[in-house]
């Protein structure tokens, strides 16, 4: 089913999302895979869930063979208007990680210092009280 290079919007492609009329978008190209649904090894439901969106990631995640990729040419009907496909949000790491990490390290240091000093002070106080009470024996 060779296409003539027509350009479709994502809205137009989304209208073809049933088992009787199924179009998908992979790598910026539109494919009418209706006739292939029954032959798909993973079943038709796998393809039907990828309609109405850019299915490139779904297609690549499965790890299709080069034969499967070559089969797509049979079903090509045109290209997608990339302006109509939503841009995927990219992860942007926080910029002020050093300030947070430094603050965490300083508070960790204070906690560890207190965990060491408080028992030491309690022990010192206990020995001091014991020593004081022994040396100050009651005078009779």
From Swiss-Prot:
SUPFAM superfamilies: Cytochrome b5-like heme/steroid binding domain
Coiled coil ranges: none
Pfam family, one: Cyt-b5
TM regions (residue ranges): 109-129
Gene3D superfamilies named among the record's database cross-references: Cytochrome b5-like heme/steroid binding domain
Keyword Hydrolase: no
Location of the Cytochrome b5 heme-binding domain: 5-81
UniProt function note: Membrane bound hemoprotein which function as an electron carrier for several membrane bound oxygenases, including fatty acid desaturases.
Protein name as annotated: Cytochrome B5 isoform D
Organism of origin: Arabidopsis thaliana
